[in-house]
Amino acid sequence: MPLHMQQVHWMPSPPLAPDDGPIDRAHLARMTLGDHGLAREVLAMFAGQSAGVMDSLMGTPSNAADLAHTLKGSAMAIGAFRVADAAEWLESTLRSETEGAEALAALDDAVAEVRLAIDAILKRS
């Protein structure tokens, strides 16, 4: 029985380390049970919610720590861990009654980065 050689087309392997993007796509897929439509819906909801929360936080309302806590939970659900960390920093800063300007700026930057990533994901999907 002759042995036939077959050309195997090489495909690059996925990276060993996860992408360092602002959204952990594997986490998002787990949270949405692999449902691409649901993932898009959740991302769109987060984009809207985060914009509203950031607008509110810029006015330093009395419930700012609670708003930061809410944003932290939402960010964790979609895999936006930098936003979650920044929201946690702001929340703990506000609850300790110390100046939160630096933490708020970090959160604003993290949210802006995630919203850009969400826009790109929604446009390409």
Label for each model-derived stretch:
Residues 1-20:
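Intrinsically disordered or compositionally simple regulatory linkers and C-terminal tails
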Residues 21-70, 77, 100-122:
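Long, amphipathic alpha-helical coiled-coil segments characteristic
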Residues 68, 75, 87-90, 94:
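Hydrophobic helical segment of the DHp/HisKA dimerization and phosphotransfer domain
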Residues 9-11, 36, 73:
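Short alpha-helical transmembrane interface motifs in multi-pass membrane proteins
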Residues 89, 120-125:
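Long amphipathic alpha-helical segments
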